[in-house]
Amino acid sequence: MKKINKIVLAVGGTGGHIIPALAARETFIHEDIEVLLLGKGLAHFLGDDSEIAYCDIPSGSPFSLRVNRMFSGAKQLYKGYVAALQKIRDFTPDLAIGFGSYHSLPAMLASIRSRIPLFLHEQNIVPGKVNKLFSRFAKGVGMSFAAAGEHFHCRAEEVFLPIRKLSEQIVFPGASPVICVVGGSQGAKILNDVVPKALARIRESYSNLYVHHIVGPKGDLQAVSQVYQDAGINHTVTAFDHNMLGVLQASDLVISRSGATMLNELLWVQVPAILIPYPGAYGHQEVNAKFFTHTVGGGTMILQKYLTEESLSKQVLLALDPATSENRRKAMLSAQQKKSFKSLYQFICESL
């Protein structure tokens, strides 16, 4: 097999796509492979990180049912395609890997046009439109969950999704239990509104309760913090946390959306969770949550339309019961031990 020297990662959009791509990038860098990220929205997520080679290119969704949006999306998509084509010609990669979402479309199209081998990585159990469509042109798909395989038109195999690095161990002295609240990389207003009030209801049952609440970039830190302060709950409220793995390891319970990255990290550290799936995006988060709660047994799910202070506080009290928590941790450990530990890099080498 020809040595792989350069790889393009076609990625963009939210953390659910970008975080797995960055984790995969680390494994490729370890193999002395040069990596370039191409996609829309990278500058917003990566900022001035000089260690990561990336190019933010335009893109648009061609899937809108509104004609004006469809044409606008197609126009942006073409601009991005032209830009990606030039970047790929300059970079001369040996292969490209798409991580889903329309933000990655220009780079994936340019890779196919340049006759570069294309691979895909699918984070969710129900793939999005882009990965399902492009699997017809791909050499293989590495999946975080084996159940996604039935949706693809090429070789598909479960691979180990790299976990974000642990920056440092986190300890909350004297705190018990510790609850982590996170609404994904973009935050979730309903979690910011409902969760603090729900946890205020259980304050009398847990005098040493500590809450680490990640509100997202648009969240109102002051308003969320005020609810905890009024309830006498020790807490930290932040817009983002770069040591997510450390926070999860220090937690007794997580209240979160059910994106694929979060589920993989929860399984890795075996921390039970209450999941409130995002109701849009073709329902993939609900499928993720059902897998985690029903198949794995790692927690419980509350659909957003049923999320109230009362419904959540009841589930939190149940989740913090020692026997319930221990059973859920054991179930997660069992599920994690059954998962594949073949890396995406190994899968690609076998498929070339």
Curated annotation (Swiss-Prot):
It is an enzyme of class 2 (transferase). It is a peripheral membrane protein. It catalyses: di-trans,octa-cis-undecaprenyl diphospho-N-acetyl-alpha-D-muramoyl-L-alanyl-D-glutamyl-meso-2,6-diaminopimeloyl-D-alanyl-D-alanine + UDP-N-acetyl-alpha-D-glucosamine = di-trans,octa-cis-undecaprenyl diphospho-[N-acetyl-alpha-D-glucosaminyl-(1->4)]-N-acetyl-alpha-D-muramoyl-L-alanyl-D-glutamyl-meso-2,6-diaminopimeloyl-D-alanyl-D-alanine + UDP + H(+). Its main location: membrane. Keywords: Cell cycle, Cell division, Cell inner membrane, Cell membrane, Cell shape, Cell wall biogenesis/degradation, Glycosyltransferase, Membrane, Peptidoglycan synthesis, Transferase. Gene3D superfamilies: Glycogen Phosphorylase B (3.40.50.2000). It holds the Pfam family Glyco_tran_28_C. UDP-N-acetyl-alpha-D-glucosamine binds at residues 14-16, 124, 164, 185, 285. Cell wall formation. Catalyzes the transfer of a GlcNAc subunit on undecaprenyl-pyrophosphoryl-MurNAc-pentapeptide (lipid intermediate I) to form undecaprenyl-pyrophosphoryl-MurNAc-(pentapeptide)GlcNAc (lipid intermediate II). This is UDP-N-acetylglucosamine--N-acetylmuramyl-(pentapeptide) pyrophosphoryl-undecaprenol N-acetylglucosamine transferase.
